[in-house]
From Swiss-Prot:
This is ATP-dependent dethiobiotin synthetase BioD. The active site is at K48. GO terms for biological process: biotin biosynthetic process. Its EC number is 6.3.3.3.
């Protein structure tokens, strides 16, 4: 893995999460939509680290694949909807991180900005030896953490931030994500921003509200959400 440990340039941002299904894809789409709206003279790369089962890559292709000066890439795909090392084992395949690394390098060389969606949580296995946190740290990817607005979210977030610090992930901030209409009215109860900032010493960059399916596929609506984030705290915007 030593060949992968060079510094990655700061135009690349990794979107990680506290768990599977917490809103990483919606958050990534909203950030990408903001770039689409505000960076007309720039080129963009959107990458899913790897995919198991169906889902994110197809949505990204639908939303962004047709845009000029955009590339949407998922370098490794497995049909089995399990953690990547287990999916690869079941399919008789191996996980070649060299392919993922080279894809990232190519995206960085060809685009002004690169946005990468992780899988699962920071503790999720990517190979039999490495987790998402290990990859983020090894590749020096500046990272934001998506926190679900639900009971137990603060404990999840604090534990994930502790893991990030242990593995030396360059964590830049938190994004709160509402997966249900009820969650929007429970932010202060379930994922109190002031308490999260106090315990993690990281800024809460913004809140992704509950979105209907049609809203999740509307670039203008997605861009509106991200425009309210504290993106001045990130170097990419």
């Amino acid at each position: 893995m030593s060949n992968f440990s060079r510094a990655v340039d700061q135009k690349t941002l990794l979107v990680a999460g506290c768990d599977t299904g917490v809103g990483k894809t919606v958050t990534t789409s909203a950030l990408a939509a903001y770039w689409w709206k505000c960076g007309k003279d720039q080129s963009f790369g959107l990458m899913k680290l790897m995919q198991t089962g169906l889902g994110d890559d197809e949505l990204y292709q639908q939303l962004f694949g047709h845009l000029t000066r955009w590339d949407v890439v998922t370098p490794l795909k497995f049909a089995t909807p399990l953690a990547p090392p287990l999916a690869a084992d079941q399919e008789g395949k191996t996980i070649d991180l060299g392919v993922v690394w080279q894809t990232l390098q190519t995206m960085q060389q060809n685009h002004d900005h690169v946005l990468v969606e992780a899988l699962g949580s920071l503790g999720s296995p990517v190979t039999h030896e490495l987790t998402v946190a290990d990859i983020a740290a090894l590749w020096r990817l500046e990272t934001i953490l998506v926190v679900p607005v639900q009971l137990g979210a603060m404990g999840q977030a604090i534990a994930q931030v502790a893991l990030a610090r242990q593995t030396k992930v360059k964590l830049k901030g938190l994004v709160l994500s509402c997966a249900s209409p009820e969650a929007e009215g429970k932010v202060e109860d379930w994922a109190t921003p002031a308490m999260l900032e106090s315990f993690t010493h990281l800024p809460v960059l913004g809140i992704v509200p509950y979105l209907t399916e049609s809203e999740r596929e509307n670039l203008s609506r997605l861009a509106e959400i991200t425009a309210r984030f504290g993106l001045e705290k990130l170097a990419y915007f």
